[in-house]
């Protein structure tokens, strides 16, 4: 056998390995093939090919493993059990950029499924190597490493802290300054997932100088990048007044308000979320948002979208209104109440209705003027029907009841109160009658109208426990009228009159 024939055997073996690993990588892209591949023992075969002498075979084997691990947590668990991770981590530091990208993809695919699998990656020493990859010359390697670090950090504070301790944050801040959009996106996303867990982790992101760089990119034309930037700034802002103030000091207003008009729904939602996370902390921060035109802009945004995109804006209006009478009035003046009423009536999802009910309650609870602004939009009957409906979720019922109570206890606008005399259950009726007992003694026109509209008659029909607060309210209302008027409208009075007619003896001339 000649030398050429001998070498041909090796060439054929190499071709067969190449063909096999390429086919497996291709088959792994289709979900219907996954179980068959797993049952055929593909993991152990790919593990061997990771150590192949041919670099392209190594890279394709890593790619195939990543695709399999990405599919479900059982396959990711198999990667861990087959002891593949240490091999990947070792090669990640030694190999070329193509292999690094493929190996980082496997780590990301394993780590995304659960904290336990992410911890397995940390335990095999991958973090230090991934952080080194963030300094790689190739942007694709940086991007792959940032993906893997993000998927580890997002699970919980402990894993995030491990990523921070490995020195990832300053390098991720450098990555958001790189020209490649894809790298900027994933670096911003990783910073967001680190910051979300605790004030301390968010402070680490701030200390690395991330906020100023993120704020400068709010107007970047790439929607996905804006989505991630706004998310990262929200995750920093949400934890404390100090962190929210640091974000505000990066001069995000008024530029962030332009994002509320963006074509992309996620950009709108995340911009609303950022404004909410700032406004919720203090009256001063809410006032800053109002002064920047944030309340009016959020109300316009709520009007231009539907569903969950509306939710953070609805909550933001509630937070602003909750702080003070003046801030609640700012929401009213900006026509926030009609928009919230529309959400309450139109939105099919109970959790969005519940948020709108809560926000309306926060607006109406301050003074009679605030309560009237809510009542004139015909919101109270809608809240009552949501509270009474058996189809409403428990949370929606609770929030509707609380909103009704908040508004009723300040409401002196009687046309809005009167329908409640007929429709409200006893626990709500008490508050309605209470409001009439406050207004009627001081308003002669209202007293007359209360008689002609049938309100006084209805009050006489209410069965109240003797000595109860409700009975006190009824007595207070009755004391506003002559005794014979109260008797005239009391149940059974017509029968009494008829008895008197029957028993009356005409005087004979």
Curated annotation (Swiss-Prot):
One of its GO terms (biological process) is epithelial cilium movement involved in extracellular fluid movement. InterPro entries: ARM-like, ARM-type_fold, Armadillo. Keywords: Cell projection, Cilium, Cilium biogenesis/degradation, Cytoplasm, Cytoskeleton, Flagellum, Microtubule, Repeat. Transmembrane segments: none annotated. Gene3D superfamilies: Leucine-rich Repeat Variant (1.25.10.10). ARM repeats lie at residues 31-70, 73-112, 115-154, 157-196, 199-238, 241-280, 325-365, 368-409. One of its GO terms (molecular function) is microtubule binding. Highly expressed in testis. It is found in: Cytoplasm, Cytoskeleton; Cell projection, Cilium, Flagellum; Cytoplasm, Cytoskeleton, Cilium axoneme. The keyword Nucleus does not apply. Its main location: cytoplasm. GO terms for cellular component: acrosomal vesicle; axoneme; extracellular region; microtubule; microtubule cytoskeleton; nucleus; sperm principal piece. Important for structural integrity of the central apparatus in the sperm tail and for flagellar motility. Interacts with SPAG16 and SPAG17. This is Sperm-associated antigen 6. It comes from Homo sapiens (Human).
